[in-house]
């Protein structure tokens, strides 16, 4: 039983906290307040997302087993090393789906629909004939859509009357793509041998360190541009947070260059003290900029030229 629980990656449930920015954005942009949030909706929403994610992890572990044996760490996964049966893996997959969709239904219909899309994306990513994880660049783009879906799920916990602005949706999607490309880059460097890397992950046959690094820079630029549009459009005070967001991206990129980089395991990033300090600093700045007005920034919202007195 323990090995079947392990492939559900319960330790990865911490990543489902990526729904919380969706909650925060909904509170910022709609008429709802913190007291309007149903704790039951928050509970069902969070754990519904966790169950759907675990369903995707289960099929990921099973279908990746023939390739994981070439990875220096993943070769020790239960599906690779132990005699696990497909029928019980499918039963586990079905159980997580049932509970995930049930909990999602208890939030609202839009949350349920988004959960179904999250489930479908897991199939597209892992299951042939598409199996997008084997397709260069599309592997990152398709997997990181889940980041945008989590933002939507957080939003729908608060309100089902609207959807978030496209700028924050695209920015969050591209931030996920940046994290995934950086993870690929760190993983490729850690394996150290292109031929072995290609056996482990088919997309690595066409990737190189240069391509992965360049793509991560592209996603970072796309993300920060979209996030910048959102921040400046809805509250000019958020402009003060942007340099620290740039710093966060730069620091994370530097982390990916470390030997056996922590960027390979996003679920363990909470152990990176400097990174968490930066994240906490940005959160505090966002809170300050939400409740404080800085009049000296107001002229920046005007399209008029700044006049000089000679």
What kind of region is each of these model predictions?
Residues 1-69, 82-95:
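Topogenic membrane-insertion module of multi-pass membrane proteins
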Residues 65, 70-116, 151, 165-177, ...:
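Multi-pass membrane catalytic core of lipid/isoprenoid biosynthesis enzymes
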Residues 48-80, 132-142, 178-190, 250-251:
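Acidic (Asp/Glu-rich) catalytic motifs at the cytosolic membrane interface
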Residues 157-240:
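Helix-loop elements that line ligand-binding/catalytic pockets
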Residues 253, 258-310:
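Generic C-terminus detector
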Residues 25-47, 101-113, 151-171, 225-239, ...:
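Helix-coil boundary and interhelical linker segments in multi-pass alpha-helical membrane proteins
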Residues 89-130, 221-257:
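Transmembrane helix-loop-helix
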Residues 1-15, 78-89, 126-146, 186-217, ...:
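Interhelical loop and helix-boundary elements at the membrane-water interface
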């Amino acid at each position: 039983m323990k090995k079947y629980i392990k492939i559900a990656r319960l330790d990865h449930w911490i990543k489902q906290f990526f729904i919380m920015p969706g909650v925060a954005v909904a509170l910022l942009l709609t008429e709802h307040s913190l007291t309007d949030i149903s704790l039951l909706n928050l509970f069902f929403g969070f754990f519904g997302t966790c169950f759907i994610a675990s369903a995707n992890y289960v099929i990921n572990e099973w279908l990746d087993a023939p390739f994981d044996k070439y990875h220096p760490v993943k070769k020790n996964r239960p599906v690779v090393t132990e005699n696990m049966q497909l029928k019980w893996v499918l039963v586990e997959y079905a159980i997580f789906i049932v509970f995930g969709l049930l909990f999602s239904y208890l939030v609202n219909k839009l949350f349920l629909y988004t959960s179904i899309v999250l489930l479908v994306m897991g199939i597209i990513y892992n299951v042939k004939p598409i199996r997008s994880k084997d397709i260069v660049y599309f592997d990152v783009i398709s997997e990181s859509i889940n980041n945008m879906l989590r933002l939507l799920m957080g939003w729908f916990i608060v309100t089902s009357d609207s959807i978030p602005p496209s700028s924050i949706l695209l920015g969050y999607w591209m931030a996920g793509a940046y994290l995934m490309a950086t993870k690929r880059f760190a993983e490729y460097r850690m394996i150290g041998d292109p031929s072995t890397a290609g056996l482990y992950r088919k997309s690595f046959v066409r990737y190189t360190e240069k391509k992965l690094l360049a793509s991560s820079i592209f996603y970072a630029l796309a993300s920060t541009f979209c996030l910048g549009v959102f921040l400046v459009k809805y509250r000019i005070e958020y402009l003060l947070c942007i340099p620290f967001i740039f710093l966060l991206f730069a620091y994370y990129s530097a982390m990916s260059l470390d030997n056996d980089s922590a960027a390979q395991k996003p679920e363990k990033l909470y152990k990176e003290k400097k990174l968490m300090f930066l994240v906490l600093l940005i959160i505090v700045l966002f809170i300050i900029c939400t409740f404080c007005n800085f009049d000296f920034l107001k002229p920046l919202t005007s399209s008029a030229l700044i006049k000089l007195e000679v």
